Amino acid sequence: MGRTPCCDKIGLKKGPWTPEEDEVLVAHIKKNGHGSWRTLPKLAGLLRCGKSCRLRWTNYLRPDIKRGPFTADEEKLVIQLHAILGNRWAAIAAQLPGRTDNEIKNLWNTHLKKRLLSMGLDPRTHEPLPSYGLAKQAPSSPTTRHMAQWESARVEAEARLSRESMLFSPSFYSGVVKTECDHFLRIWNSEIGEAFRNLAPLDESTITSQSPCSRATSTSSALLKSSTNSWGGKEVTVAIHGSDYSPYSNDLEDDSTDSALQLLLDFPISDDDMSFLEENIDSYSQAPPIGLVSMVSKF
């Protein structure tokens, strides 16, 4: 059940008002007053709807209507009243004598609303606009809020997957390897690398001709220490091998041990057999506890 219509609207005229109709309406209201707008058309002899007569009188034919553009004070007052009353144009028009609600509505939609947008204000709330503009408003219902949450979660998941795929892609590692290669290449081309390049090269023939066994022998022979002592008119050279161990020198140490033992057995026996130990005990005390002692008799 809605509001009952003001008239039957059968055989009534529609469209713009003619000047003759305006004169009839103004003359009737000046003489009798408007009274009830439902019965006015029949009393005035107009083929118009009661609502149409009311709007025509209120918005155009009223004698106290102020004509012409709105002043700056009137526009400022409209903006202030709209912030309080919203789109209640009739209530706003009641605060501006001589201005109709239709005029104020047209003024707002054509000028004042655009002015607020250019100033960065929301025309509905008169608050500063968000940084992302009017297109992205805050969700107003639980459904829209949930949709916004799902959308943000989806965007975050896609960003995380794209980062992981970039880490596992071959192009990413090739870029890392290339960076490391460039790093070592820069070191090689620097002053440090130049110092290494200026080193004198080793003789390849010497390196290739030496076997592992010969290199071990030469190393151990470099560690030998010799001392000469006189035992009863004979010079004896005592060679002390270092304690460095080499897997290639085991056979050499066994041979030298056998030869040293044979020399001790062949050593001539004299009356003072212990003089050798008494005279050379200091030189034996200086020798390392581990090592091989070989004695070679020189005549």
From Swiss-Prot:
Task: Print the keywords alphabetically.
Answer: DNA-binding, Flowering, Nucleus, Repeat, Transcription, Transcription regulation
Quote the cellular component terms of the Gene Ontology held in the record.
nucleus
Tissue note: Expressed in the shoot apex, young flower buds, developing carpels and siliques. Expressed in floral meristem, initiating floral primordia and developing flowers.
Location in the cell: Nucleus
Query: What functional role does this protein have?
Result: Transcription factor that may play a role in flower development by repressing ANT. Regulates the transition of meristem identity from vegetative growth to flowering. Acts downstream of LFY and upstream of AP1. Directly activates AP1 to promote floral fate. Together with LFY and AP1 may constitute a regulatory network that contributes to an abrupt and robust meristem identity transition.
Q: Which residues bind DNA?
A: 37-61, 89-112
After gene disruption, what is the outcome? Meristem identity phenotype; increased number of cauline leaves and secondary inflorescences.
Q: Which species does this protein come from?
A: Arabidopsis thaliana (Mouse-ear cress)
- Read off the InterPro entries from this record: Homeodomain-like_sf, Myb_dom, Myb_TF_plants, SANT/Myb
Name it: Transcription factor MYB17
> Which Gene Ontology BP terms does the record give?
flower development; regulation of flower development
Q: Which gene encodes it?
A: MYB17
Principal location listed in the UniProt entry? nucleus
Q: Which GO terms describe its molecular function?
A: DNA binding; DNA-binding transcription factor activity
- Assembly and binders: Interacts with LFY.
Secretion signal span: none
Limits of the HTH myb-type domain: 9-61, 62-116
Q: Which PANTHER family match?
A: MYB FAMILY TRANSCRIPTION FACTOR, TRANSCRIPTION FACTOR MYB17
